[in-house]
């Protein structure tokens, strides 16, 4: 299945299901180039190559008397990791499935969701609505302007006085600009800027400026975003990382969800061995109101793939992000 078809023909839930974190870890680090060698990391702890997995699968198949390899149904297995890391679910495929071309991890038959016992309070990638897009938003401008006019009247102001007579329309246009990310899709922003490249070391772009709107109080929060990923023979144009930040920050947001959405979008774009995102934000809802803590900052992170499973890879990324 081609990358273009993935984005244009699959629904948001299908795209996000495909990278649920049961499918992301080390044993599914697959090459999308001309060979199937596993992508290298700063540490090989807990990883296995594609050839090893295929050999193990063949051995399991021949253990069943009289059963050819191709007839053995795929079965999930828990792979123990080094140290105190938790086991991860590895989905084995036999390559004969019509929807499996060997270039992409297979989606779990029953992906975990917030309704799965024990995960009621969790947010999974398929819950993030990356492709949410409302109806034509420019058509909402008159209604939005009328709402702002009512708001001014509710404050005891005269919306017809000279300084405010055009304020409702200006405020409505400003709000449309602040949330213009709803009008953008990942496919449009990437615009084909995904390139074959035999580069298997970490790529980090840090201190990307970000502005967003808190969905709780409709006041701004702003800060910086740092993104790192470990390529699997695919790299992304560097400016596209900043544009991905722009898509999701220009929406009504909470910082935690914004961080996840950026990480999932990079994963969809280049299917890397792992993605790491750190966001540092200043929230005006904490500065202008409430506790009024002017110097407070909020830091959130999302680690996927090797960045989540390999402490050395994660440490390397954090050192690069924190270096001056």
Swiss-Prot record:
Annotated Low complexity bias: 40-49
Catalytic activity: GTP + H2O = 7,8-dihydroneopterin 3'-triphosphate + formate + H(+)
Pathway this chain belongs to: Cofactor biosynthesis; 7,8-dihydroneopterin triphosphate biosynthesis; 7,8-dihydroneopterin triphosphate from GTP: step 1/1
Residue stretches of biased makeup (Polar residues): 50-59, 93-117
Expression by tissue: Isoform B is expressed almost exclusively in adult heads.
UniProt GO cellular component terms: cytoplasm
UniProt keyword annotation of Metal-binding present: yes
GO biological process, alphabetically ordered: compound eye pigmentation; cuticle pigmentation; embryonic pattern specification; larval chitin-based cuticle development; preblastoderm mitotic cell cycle; pteridine biosynthetic process; regulation of epithelial cell migration, open tracheal system; tetrahydrobiopterin biosynthetic process
One Pfam assignment: GTP_cyclohydroI
Keywords tagged on the record: Allosteric enzyme, GTP-binding, Hydrolase, Metal-binding, Nucleotide-binding, Tetrahydrobiopterin biosynthesis, Zinc
GO molecular function, one term: zinc ion binding
Binding site for Zn(2+): 214, 217, 285
Heme listed as a keyword: no
Enzyme Commission number, as recorded: 3.5.4.16
Family: Belongs to the GTP cyclohydrolase I family.
Quaternary structure and interacting proteins, as annotated: Toroid-shaped homodecamer, composed of two pentamers of five dimers.
NCBIfam families registered for this protein in UniProt: folE, PRK09347.1-2, PRK09347.1-3
Protein name: GTP cyclohydrolase 1
Provenance organism: Drosophila melanogaster
Higher taxonomy: Eukaryota, Metazoa, Ecdysozoa, Arthropoda, Hexapoda
């Amino acid at each position: 299945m081609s990358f273009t078809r993935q984005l244009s023909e699959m629904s948001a839930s299908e795209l996000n299901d495909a990278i649920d974190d049961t499918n992301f870890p080390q044993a599914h680090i697959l090459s999308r180039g001309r060979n199937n060698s596993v992508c290298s990391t700063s540490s090989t702890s807990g990883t296995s190559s594609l050839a090893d997995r295929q050999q193990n699968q063949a051995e399991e198949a021949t253990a069943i008397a009289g059963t050819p390899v191709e007839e053995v149904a795929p079965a999930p297995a828990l792979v123990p990791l080094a140290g105190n890391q938790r086991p991860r679910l590895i989905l084995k495929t036999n390559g004969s499935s019509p929807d499996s071309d060997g270039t992409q991890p297979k989606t779990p038959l029953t992906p975990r969701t917030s309704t799965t016992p024990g995960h009621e309070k969790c947010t999974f990638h398929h819950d993030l609505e990356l492709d949410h897009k409302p109806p034509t938003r420019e058509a909402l401008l008159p209604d939005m302007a009328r709402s702002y006019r009512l708001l001014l009247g509710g404050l005891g102001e005269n919306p017809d006085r000279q300084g405010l007579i055009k304020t409702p329309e200006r405020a409505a246009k400003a709000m449309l600009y602040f949330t213009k990310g709803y009008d953008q899709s990942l496919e449009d922003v990437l615009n084909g800027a995904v390139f074959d490249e035999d580069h298997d070391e970490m790529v980090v772009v840090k201190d990307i400026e970000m502005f967003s709107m808190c969905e709780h109080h409709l006041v701004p929060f702003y800060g910086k975003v740092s993104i790192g990923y470990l390529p699997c023979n695919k790299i992304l144009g560097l400016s596209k990382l900043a544009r991905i930040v722009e898509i999701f920050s220009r929406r009504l947001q909470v910082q935690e969800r914004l961080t996840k959405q950026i990480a999932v979008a990079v994963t969809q774009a280049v299917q890397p061995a792992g993605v790491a995102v750190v966001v540092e934000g200043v929230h005006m809802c904490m500065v202008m109101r409430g506790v009024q803590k002017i110097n407070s900052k909020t830091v959130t992170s999302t680690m996927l793939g090797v960045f989540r499973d390999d402490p050395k890879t994660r440490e390397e990324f954090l050192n690069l992000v924190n270096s001056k």
